[in-house]
Amino acid sequence: MKPGIHPDYHPVVFQDANTGKQFLTRSTLTSARTVEWETSEGVREYPLVVVEVTSDSHPFWTGSRRIVDAAGQVEKFRRRYGSRKSGASSD
């Protein structure tokens, strides 16, 4: 590997925005927010990255369904593209 071309890979705490559960792992992501985490070497401070979905809240892993705002997505599509009719003109 060439030195100096790879991003810094360091410990980071990810927090699920829905459940509040936190996971300590390694990542290239960083954040200005920090959190204290108890380790075998004492309490350490790590960057905190808040994410929308983790395995703690994803329906595939929890076995529960989550209501998705499909109606809002449909309205956004209709506003953007309107109700376009077939392109054939009757001349």
From Swiss-Prot:
HAMAP family: Ribosomal_bL31_2. The keyword Ribonucleoprotein applies. It comes from Mycolicibacterium vanbaalenii (strain DSM 7251 / JCM 13017 / BCRC 16820 / KCTC 9966 / NRRL B-24157 / PYR-1). It comes from the Bacteria. PROSITE patterns: RIBOSOMAL_L31. Belongs to the bacterial ribosomal protein bL31 family. Type B subfamily. Part of the 50S ribosomal subunit. GO terms for cellular component: ribonucleoprotein complex; ribosome. Keywords: Ribonucleoprotein, Ribosomal protein. This is Large ribosomal subunit protein bL31B. GO terms for molecular function: structural constituent of ribosome. The lineage of its organism: Bacteria, Bacillati, Actinomycetota, Actinomycetes, Mycobacteriales. InterPro entries: Ribosomal_bL28/bL31-like_sf, Ribosomal_bL31, Ribosomal_bL31_B, Ribosomal_bL31_sf. One of its GO terms (biological process) is translation. The keyword Ribosomal protein applies.
